[in-house]
Each structure stands twice: as structure tokens, then as C-alpha cells.
Amino acid sequence: VDDVNALARTGSEIRQWIIDTPFQAELEDAIKAAFEQLEQEAGGEASFAVRSSATAEDMPDASFAGQQETFLNVKGLDAVMTAIKHVFASLFNDRAISYRVHQGYDHKGVALSAGIQRMVRSDCASSGVMFTIDTESGFEDVVFITSSYGLGEMVVQGAVNPDEFYVHKPTLDKGKPAVVRRNLGSKLKKMIYSTDMGHGKQVEIVDVEHNDSHRFSLTDTEVMELAKQAQIIEQHYKRPMDIEWAKDGVDGKLYIVQARPETVRSREDAQTIERFHLKGKAKVVCEGRAIGHKIGSGVAKVLASIEEMDKIQPGDVLVTDMTDPDWEPIMKKASAIVTNRGG
């Protein structure tokens, strides 16, 4: 996987094999029957999300978040069938192959399913991710919530700077106002439904109106309600959780759309704190929000797009506008990453 061009060629070929292979008749019939029932329950022509869910046998702590594809605003059986095939094929995305190799996972030991969910109309409201642990420090007495306008993929992929809220669990349990910190994100872009129903084109990214980007995308009441639901989920699974949520702009309700174990901070020793100090001094060229606590150094390589990935050598500092999971194959090479936006 160190040769990113060879990785891209191999991954593309494997994915095409999967897409070109017809469904088994039994599976196709089962999908049709289940989708017809789902449409009836939705009451009319509804939009659906076709999502991936991967797991590895005997590796419950393996994290496959963001590795496979999700398709949003999918309408009709034919479009759902197409999306399911592409979800299955995404088990061999470049980033997924690279991740498994770096983690030492057997490609044959990873299982993948496609889930079909009715869409929450967060394109008319907001959505985001919340953690039942502080992702920076590992402190377990807070719920950390991120929120931005539109469909949640923008937050999940790190494509926007979202609003951030910290809710203190013990205070929330006492029924008192518990939002202890809030940061206003820039929220410059949002993902909404597109009028183009071609595969992979059902959503589009547009600018957020100036007034909206300069106000919070959730009220404190909504933030605390989300935190309450996050605690219920955490208590059920008995471990810190990573949860995706969405607000429906039509009915005004908050929905939980996905929950999975938090697999980074919860693995670390909560009694140990690492601190790194830069001994040298020089003029500060630029500043920003840090993700993580370590110090990286190396030759800065400015990349205009993901197509230039092969320019990165081990130890380089990757500088680009934004990264998403597709950049995973070279993230292991870089000593540090600097971007204009995302998180």
C-alpha cells in the first residue's frame, strides 16, 4: 500500500468486479420485499440512506468509521439496488484497503452489511456527531456534541468547522442547565438534496447563508436533550459511544441515526496524561485548532488535491485545504497534517 498508484488501480479493479456481479436471486427478492415494506411504512415517496456497517470477527474494538461509502437521498428500488452494490464494493476502497493493511487485519476477516434507513430531513435543519467522552482529554464526565447545517456527512467527513458543545453529565443528571462550553463554528457549507437522481449525485453542497453561519445551529435545550439520549445509549452499551444524530426540519424532532463504540480515547489510560513541550522558539507563522497533543515536524508539502498524494514522502508535513477518509493511505506517512477546514 506504500505505492498509492498501484493501490488505486487494484482497488478500482476489485470494486468493479463486485459492481458487475449480479445479486443472487434469493438476496434480490429479499431486498425487494423489505424495501416495499419500508416504502409502505414511510407513506409515499420517501428518500432513503443506504449505509455501510462493517465488523471484524474477534476484533470488537476495530474501528471502520468512515472507511466505506454512504449514499443519501436515494429514491426507488432500482436506485437502492445500485447503491447497495456500491456499498458492498466500498469494502475495497483505497482507504479501507490501506487501513486494514496498516492495522494488520485480514481482508477476508472483515464483514460488511448495507443498511437502508428512511432519511431524516436534516437538509432543512442540522445534524452532527456526539461523543460520551471528551475526545481531546478522555474526560468521561462530559458529552461532546458537534453540529452543523444540512446532512450529517459534512460533519462526519470533516468538511466543515461545526459548532461545538460540552455538556456536564453530573449537572445534567440533576436537571440543571449543563452546557458548560460552546464554540461557534464557521459552518460555511452544507449538504442538501439535489434534483439530480443519478447515482452518487442525489446530494449537493451549497453555501450557508451569512446570518445562519454566524449563529448556533442548535439551542441549549436541544443540546441537553441530545446529551440525555447520549447518556442513555452509553448506559445501555456500558462504554463510551460515538453517536450520529440529525434534526428533522419538517417535524422538528431529534433523531439518533447511528451509534458505535468510541475507539480512540476510551482505549487510553484515563489516569495518565501526556504533555509535549516545544523547546525551540521562532516566529509563529499561523495558528489553529489542534487535534491531538503531539508535535510533528518535517518538510511541508502543499497538495492542491488528493490526486497529488504520491508527492508525500514519509515524515513530510501534509498541507492542504481539507482532508477526508480518502486521504487515509498517506496519513500514516505524514508527521503532521495542516488544513484550512475540517476536524
Region annotations inferred by a language model:
Residues 1-115, 210-221, 225-229, 234-238, ...:
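N-terminal beta-alpha lobe that positions the nucleotide/phosphoryl donor
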Residues 54, 118-120, 149, 220, ...:
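Short, flexible loop/turn elements at secondary-structure junctions
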Residues 56-59, 123, 151-153, 249-255, ...:
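Flexible loop/turn segments at secondary-structure boundaries
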Residues 64-98, 123-197, 257-289, 333-341:
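Extended active-site and interfacial segments that coordinate phosphate-rich ligands
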Residues 66, 239-263:
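Conserved metal-phosphate-binding beta-hairpin within the catalytic cores
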Residues 142-242, 247, 281-297, 305-308, ...:
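Conserved catalytic alpha/beta cores of large enzymes that bind or transform nucleotide phosphates
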Residues 301-343:
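Feature captures the catalytic cores and cofactor-binding loops of soluble hydro-lyases/lyases
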